[in-house]
């Protein structure tokens, strides 16, 4: 479970940059998939090949029939599914960290530029306005959440889309390989079996229950992804149409003095003493 805990810790870091649906999806992934895979499901399939027997003594027949019945173990397929559906979220987290790092660099650069501009008198405002092209679009806070903007929004939507695609793809793979139920007897006619033989699976009913449970969890995750995708699209369109004129651009440094007048072009503030005061880094989420 230590490896799964590391994955869970990474996914937990995405929560501040996710919607409520994304947070629920992470809980569903960890509680109903990772915990079960690491405990009950793994133990249920521990005797999968050892207890697979066929009514023949022909050497190699059981191995060939087992390979035909289960090209890949259910547990290993579900592990791959967890990894694949987690990758888009982790890539979104990497993009978030990249943007944060770039903003930190921009903040340091502008702090140095503003210090120089402060001592250059009237040229300070002109120097400051040179950086308007570097300003990032900010989001305002609403109900404790953060509004996604620009490329981060596109990355988040892409991560939801690919998670949905992977969910459907793995469901189709599972259905194509061995369906969603297991029978107690598997009929095999593969060579080197001398004739048609019957092979017997261990605990087929228990495994079928787990298979159906994982199927339900996959479908719930898919529905959550679809709902979240439409929600994010709706909010993005609504914010674009309703708040287009109210969007602000700001410098990634902290506003310190209150007795200042804001510029109409950017959230850059010029004080009465001609001192340039940096403006705070607003988040790119709401």
Swiss-Prot record:
<dbReference type="InterPro" id="IPR000500">
    <property type="entry name" value="Connexin"/>
</dbReference>
<feature type="topological domain" description="Cytoplasmic">
    <location>
        <begin position="1"/>
        <end position="23"/>
    </location>
</feature>
<dbReference type="InterPro" id="IPR038359">
    <property type="entry name" value="Connexin_N_sf"/>
</dbReference>
<feature type="transmembrane region" description="Helical">
    <location>
        <begin position="77"/>
        <end position="99"/>
    </location>
</feature>
<dbReference type="InterPro" id="IPR013092">
    <property type="entry name" value="Connexin_N"/>
</dbReference>
<dbReference type="GO" id="GO:0007507">
    <property type="term" value="P:heart development"/>
</dbReference>
<dbReference type="GO" id="GO:0005922">
    <property type="term" value="C:connexin complex"/>
</dbReference>
<feature type="topological domain" description="Extracellular">
    <location>
        <begin position="175"/>
        <end position="209"/>
    </location>
</feature>
<dbReference type="GO" id="GO:0007267">
    <property type="term" value="P:cell-cell signaling"/>
</dbReference>
<keyword id="KW-0812">Transmembrane</keyword>
<feature type="topological domain" description="Cytoplasmic">
    <location>
        <begin position="100"/>
        <end position="151"/>
    </location>
</feature>
<keyword id="KW-0472">Membrane</keyword>
<comment type="function">
    <text>One gap junction consists of a cluster of closely packed pairs of transmembrane channels, the connexons, through which materials of low MW diffuse from one cell to a neighboring cell.</text>
</comment>
<protein>
    <recommendedName>
        <fullName>Gap junction alpha-6 protein</fullName>
    </recommendedName>
</protein>
<feature type="transmembrane region" description="Helical">
    <location>
        <begin position="24"/>
        <end position="41"/>
    </location>
</feature>
<comment type="subunit">
    <text>A connexon is composed of a hexamer of connexins.</text>
</comment>
<keyword id="KW-1133">Transmembrane helix</keyword>
<keyword id="KW-1003">Cell membrane</keyword>
<comment type="similarity">
    <text>Belongs to the connexin family. Alpha-type (group II) subfamily.</text>
</comment>
<dbReference type="InterPro" id="IPR019570">
    <property type="entry name" value="Connexin_CCC"/>
</dbReference>
<dbReference type="InterPro" id="IPR017990">
    <property type="entry name" value="Connexin_CS"/>
</dbReference>
<keyword id="KW-0965">Cell junction</keyword>
<dbReference type="Pfam" id="PF00029">
    <property type="entry name" value="Connexin"/>
</dbReference>
<feature type="transmembrane region" description="Helical">
    <location>
        <begin position="210"/>
        <end position="232"/>
    </location>
</feature>
<dbReference type="GO" id="GO:0005243">
    <property type="term" value="F:gap junction channel activity"/>
</dbReference>
<feature type="topological domain" description="Extracellular">
    <location>
        <begin position="42"/>
        <end position="76"/>
    </location>
</feature>
<feature type="topological domain" description="Cytoplasmic">
    <location>
        <begin position="233"/>
        <end position="286"/>
    </location>
</feature>
<feature type="transmembrane region" description="Helical">
    <location>
        <begin position="152"/>
        <end position="174"/>
    </location>
</feature>
<dbReference type="GO" id="GO:0010644">
    <property type="term" value="P:cell communication by electrical coupling"/>
</dbReference>
<keyword id="KW-0303">Gap junction</keyword>
